Amino acid sequence: MASAFLFACSESDDPSPVVDNSIPEGSVVFDISTVNKLNNGMSRGNVYSQEATQHVTRVSVYAFSNNGSDYVYAKTYDISGWSDGTTFKRYVVAEGDKLPAGDYKFLAVGRDAADQFTVTSPSVGQSYSSMMATIAQSGNESEIFSGTTTAQVLDKGSRVSIEMTRKVAGVLGYFKNVPQILDGKTVTFLRLSASNSNQQVNLTNGVGVNTSPAAYNIIDLNLSGQTVTNGIYTGNNLSAQGVVKVANSQLSGSYFMPVSSVTLTLGLYEANGNAIKTWSVKDTGGVTTFNILANHFYSLGMKVQAGNVNGGTDDPGDDDDPIDLLTDQNIVITISPAWELIHNLIIQ
């Protein structure tokens, strides 16, 4: 049996340790990595800053062999020893679990310990393109990562490197100075609504699949229990989550399935759901219909780090910058893919 050798690091900028790079004859060595580091104490289901973090605790690699017209399922490898904070692992396939030589696609999937995704459990001969992650309803999203590569498995042994990226988007809303009374009406809810939502994502390409088309409130804050000072809500308390905010601010966010051609609406609402004031969200080019993409971060207001209000640096450009709902009429959403990039969106 070929023995497994591996290493794990909890920070993405740690120096690489010295490891044995040899490949046992006839075996396959998987080098698997996630692109984001661990952030201790942050929630896995909620998003409180633009920090790119991860809490992957279980990883599987699916092998799909080339049958001449498609890549079809052959075998699954469950990568042992992956714990919360691991960003790299080397896994050697055991002697009795080798693949025949040939052309393969490999799909690595990384998940949290208690997510609500159902991931396709492929049967022999099933197409590579059929690999999906599904939730029962919008709001059940959390972190899920995947990555894919094509490689030749050789009789003498092969090394396969797979980098996993997030297959959901992140959406954050950071606001301040929400009035209790506006136009003579009591503000009870602060909501960011998407015109459509998906419940499935293709793990091979990050494209969302619409199984139950429906509008969805990505952010839905009930303000009624908050203290009011000088007519302004004092803000939601997230100290138990390790979050530090500016005074009189509202912060909320979540992961969201990729979805195309949606509009976003920010609004203040009465207890009965009637809108008091709404803003249309735009990107920096003035477009109101856009795509929410996997591994991109969409932010109304800016919060670089959850645990402070200065972004962890002396640069004032990293300071918290919540949208002021008393004065701001144009509101920018930043869209970031690093997550990969941060995009600016505007509300009017």
PLM regions with names:
Residues 33-53, 174-183:
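Structural motif
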Residues 113-161, 274-297, 304-307:
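Structured interaction patches on ligand/partner-binding surfaces of diverse proteins
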Residues 3-33, 173, 295, 300:
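Bacterial Sec-dependent N-terminal signal peptides
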Residues 27-31, 60, 105-107, 159-161, ...:
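Beta-strand secondary-structure signal
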Residues 21, 36-40, 60-62, 69:
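N-terminal extension/subdomain marker
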Residues 150-156, 165-169, 174-188:
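Secondary-structure boundary elements
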Residues 50-121, 181-294, 341-348:
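Tryptophan-paired
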Residues 26-28, 32-36, 229, 236, ...:
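Low-complexity, acidic Ser/Thr/Pro-rich "mucin-like" tracts of secreted and single-pass surface proteins
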